[in-house]
Amino acid sequence: MGIIRTHFEKLWLGEIDPLDVSPFTPLMAWEEVADRVAFVSSFANATAIATDDGLVLIDVGSFLLSAHVHAAVRDFSDSRVSHVVYTHGHVDHVFGVERFEAEAQSRGWRAPHVIAHEAVPARFRRYEISRGYNSCINARQFRTKVEWPAKYRYPDETFADKHTLEVGGLRVELFHARGETDDATWAFVPERRLLCTGDLFIWCSPNAGNPQKVQRFPRDWARALRTMATLRPAVLCPGHGVPIWGEDEVHEALSTTAELLESLHDQTLALMNEGARLVDVIHAVKAPPHLLAKPWLRPVYDQPEFIVRNIWRTYGGWWDGDPSSLEPAPRASVACELAQLSGGPSKLAARATALAESGDLALACHLAELAALAAPNDDGIARSRRAVYAARARAATSLMAKGIYNGEADPV
């Protein structure tokens, strides 16, 4: 048993705590997971499917680690790459085609043919005009400064709903689904009972609520997972994390992930239909504990509260239901009024510190923020504010929350 299969077994059996092992920490290895199928563990994974007429690659890796993916694929097979499938347009999945293209040119092969959903080109164009914003939010989220890419390898062919590849006698079925993105593709290879989910499965609570990024689609996502489960695949190769082996294991992982999304969706929509405000919805909706206890559904990247906000955004407008927020006063003005009523900004800051020490970190952050807005040039208040956010970051489980809180405590 290789390192990747061993890691899966330990995660599945609870011998590794998912809170200690991020699915985004690559094993930097590859392993044959099914007949003539290699899984490459990288920041974003790639899967190489061998046929009698070359390789089909499901994703090619990030702009930072595409060299590793290329080397791993070549360690698996020296065959030419016939097709590349983008599971979606995120930058950790779509870089590295140029390495195989250069190789094809030097060896006299046909260049790889790149296929993606029809919405991928629009995503690339959006990325090209929002480089600054994407650099900022990803630096905050991942706590590292990386220059956002300026150029992209656009697909040669796109499809709308379904597409079938016939390569070297092997059928690779491609399906569109909206989930983490509006341009997602998942792949199924019936002959090898292989499912490649892209980021529709990532070994943690689904990335359906990212606070800094565009609309996600939890309900459609759940439907796609249910469809995948009906195919009874024997191996699941995810966009992040390790593969899942076993028909029953794959079915359970897909079904429970769908169940979590369905529960959050239905609870949120029921409260919206009653006229509830967003803040009340956020605190009322509860993810089923038995689902969050699953090793593949722990909130280590995204978290249920953020998914609830995204569901609100799906059905509602930008207004949160609080009439005072419709045409709000500047927050600094509100902070100054409250500081004056409470005895000054230092009183607010001191109370924030006390609340943080008692464990009420959410309320502590509100007061720390008000104190800093009321006294923006007070170094002592600024330090206490940073300390409150540092404590909030330590208590957070999701990478997204940690990134935002750490960004205030210690900006990158």
What are the functions of these language-model segments?
Residues 2, 55, 62-64, 120-176, 220-232, ...:
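Metallo-beta-lactamase
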Residues 30, 53, 64-114:
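Active-site metal-binding motif and surrounding structural segment of the metallo-beta-lactamase
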Residues 24-77, 186-198:
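Conserved beta-strand hairpin/beta-sheet module of binuclear metal-dependent hydrolase folds
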Residues 2, 270-412:
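C-terminal regulatory/interaction regions
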Residues 36, 49, 59, 73, ...:
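Divalent metal-coordination and catalytic microenvironments
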Residues 58-60, 80-90, 115-117, 195-198, ...:
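Active-site neighborhood of phospho(di)ester-bond hydrolases with catalytic His/Asp-centered motifs
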